[in-house]
């Protein structure tokens, strides 16, 4: 093995067992259950998360139901031209960035038509209403069809259009933008209002392999997750700078050219698996945040962030790859004013592994003038010259277990041959690329560069000396034997690292904990009061400790083995 001294046991399919419930698999079995249900109900609504395959549901499920009347609620929407006009301010002309929207599902419908349908619907007949917005029609039973955002993104890449659109071949970044800034926000508002009222919940993430559970099963599962240690289902993606480390450590396909990103700590986009008697039902992990925020986040974090999960862990693999783009993130007031976000993308790079020549670019060199830097970046963007990073940007050697702190406004990127655990605030698409080393994306298009935004947020006082004194390995030994590794005082996340060869006690510090096993083959999380079963984690796995747990033990799985965990929580 090239990068590990032991065989990796990284688990790509973590799940949480939910007792006393079953999952119904396949359209035929689901149809049988719903037909029995329809004997006692007359009007049933199929509410969809945008991205659910309408044709698949119609052909394989609706066609098998004993109903007298079928209504596609989406035929009552406003004309798409009118909707596009409504969204103009939110979608902007930019390829990547939009403005966060506050639409509700009613905004996209002709409410006069909805009212007329509600007045005319014959509740004595067996009637089915389906589509995104079906719950607007009065009903006596509701089935919710859900899908994770990563699956939606994969379907965009395969040609799926946005809701109501015919943009099959449109740039996938623009599809994602419409989803991120408009569709998913609207759908989440609707989900929060209707999911507790559903009778059944259907996982549609795998094509033609639906799985259905009862509402009680779903919410029992969400509650269990919110009171036990758990992991998210990771996903991996290639990139122009991607590396080779994750192939070995995360047990990925060795025939792929590279993997650049791994997301196993982004509840807004990841899933969880709820396991019902051996059947994994995939549920967007954001559902835990929406419906169990106090258990998961804790009162302090919920009061500050609402039903948002504020911490994000992901991997950036450049070992055997290339540099990330030189970039900067917006200051808080900039992301609020320009994009309507609540808080900004402060972050850090924890070096999980590194080759001897690994570096991190961080901050500007002492004496750099704003006008000269921006002029050089603009000339490089036009292709008139190569940007001279040696002249303008600091470059620091990076070794295993270093921690580089990156408050918003600091120019940065990882160089090649580093394996980065990125620990950051959750807003995750607001990266202003300044220079991308002259590369094209995997889609063959120039990668978006946003000097027009970046020039307004670069902090020029973060020069060589300031970075050295404030952002690199600012380690502080703590009384409990841990090491405080960050983050910077401008960032709301605190990180503590623990090395141990025996059982130690850890506290949640009044906040949800997001952790990663950064050293050792495996460790075990144990309950202090017996409330949960021992939970095994393996090297490089990210795991979440809900604030509900308060305190917990962690020990090496193998006796006397040295293990290391980094813990992130909201200060």
Where are these regions (language model features)?
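Double-stranded beta-helix
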Residues: 361-388, 423-462, 558-571
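Short acidic-glycine-tyrosine-enriched beta hairpin
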Residues: 392-405, 526-549, 553
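ATP-dependent small-molecule kinase phosphotransfer cores
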Residues: 3-24, 29, 67-126
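Small-molecule kinase domains that catalyze NTP-dependent phosphoryl transfer to phosphate-bearing small molecules
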Residues: 2-7, 134-135, 158-219
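Transition-metal
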Residues: 22-25, 29-33, 196-371, 436-475, ...
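ATP-dependent NMP and nucleoside kinases share a basic, alpha-helical "lid"
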Residues: 64, 115-165
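Ligand-binding loop in jelly-roll beta-barrel domains
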Residues: 308, 318-323, 331, 354-357, ...
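Glycine-rich P-loop/Walker A and Walker A-like loops and their local beta1-loop-alpha1 context
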Residues: 19-63
């Amino acid at each position: 093995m090239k990068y590990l001294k032991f065989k990796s046991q990284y688990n790509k399919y973590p799940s949480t067992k939910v007792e006393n419930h079953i999952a119904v698999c396949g359209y035929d079995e689901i149809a049988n259950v719903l037909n029995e249900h329809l004997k006692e109900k007359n009007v049933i609504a199929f509410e969809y998360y945008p991205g659910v395959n309408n044709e698949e549901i119609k052909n394989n499920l609706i066609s098998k139901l004993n109903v007298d009347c079928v209504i596609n609620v989406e035929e009552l929407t406003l004309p798409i031209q009118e909707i596009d006009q409504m969204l103009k301010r939110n979608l902007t002309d930019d390829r990547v960035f939009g403005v966060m929207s506050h639409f509700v599902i009613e905004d996209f419908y002709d409410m006069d038509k909805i009212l007329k349908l509600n007045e005319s619907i014959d509740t004595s007949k067996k009637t089915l209403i389906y589509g995104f917005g079906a719950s607007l029609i009065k009903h006596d039973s509701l089935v919710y069809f859900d899908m994770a955002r990563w699956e939606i993104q994969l379907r965009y890449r395969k040609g799926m259009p946005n809701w109501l659109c015919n943009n099959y071949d449109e740039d996938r970044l623009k599809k994602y933008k419409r989803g991120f800034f408009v569709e998913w926000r609207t759908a989440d508002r609707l989900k929060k209002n209707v999911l507790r009222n559903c009778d059944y919940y259907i996982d549609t993430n795998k094509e033609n392999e639906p799985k259905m559970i009862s509402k009680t099963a779903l919410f029992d599962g969400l509650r269990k997750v919110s009171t036990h240690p758990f992991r998210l289902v990771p996903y991996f993606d290639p990139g122009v700078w991607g590396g080779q480390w994750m192939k070995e450590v995360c047990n990925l396909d060795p025939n792929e050219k590279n993997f650049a990103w791994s997301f196993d700590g982004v509840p807004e986009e990841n899933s969880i698996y709820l396991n019902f008697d051996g059947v994994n039902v995939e549920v967007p992990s954001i559902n835990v945040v929406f419906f169990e925020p106090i258990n998961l986040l804790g009162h302090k974090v919920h009061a500050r962030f609402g039903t948002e999960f504020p911490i994000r862990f992901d991997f950036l693999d450049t070992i055997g790859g290339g540099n990330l783009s030189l970039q900067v993130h917006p200051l808080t007031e900039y992301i609020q004013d320009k994009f309507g976000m609540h808080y900004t993308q402060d972050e850090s790079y924890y070096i999980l592994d590194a080759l001897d020549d690994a570096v991190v670019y961080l901050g500007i060199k002492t004496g750099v003038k704003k006008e000269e830097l921006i002029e050089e970046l603009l000339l490089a963007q036009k292709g008139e010259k190569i940007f001279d990073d040696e002249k303008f940007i600091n470059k620091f050697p990076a070794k295993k277990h270093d921690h580089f702190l990156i408050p918003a406004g600091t120019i940065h990127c990882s160089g090649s041959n580093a394996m980065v655990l990125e620990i950051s605030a959750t807003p995750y698409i607001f990266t202003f690329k300044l220079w991308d080393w002259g590369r094209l994306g995997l889609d063959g298009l120039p990668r978006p560069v946003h000097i027009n935004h970046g020039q307004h947020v670069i902090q020029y006082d973060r020069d060589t000396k300031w970075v050295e004194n404030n952002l690199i390995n600012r380690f502080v030994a703590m009384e409990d034997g841990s090491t405080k590794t960050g983050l910077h005082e401008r960032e709301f996340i605190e990180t503590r690292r623990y090395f141990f060869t025996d059982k130690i006690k850890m506290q949640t510090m009044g906040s949800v904990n997001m952790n990663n096993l950064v050293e050792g083959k495996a460790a075990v999380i144990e309950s202090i009061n017996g409330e949960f079963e021992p939970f095994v984690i393996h090297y490089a796995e990210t795991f979440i400790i809900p604030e509900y747990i308060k305190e917990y033990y962690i020990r090496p799985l193998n006796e006397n083995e040295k293990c290391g965990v980094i813990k992130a929580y909201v200060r």
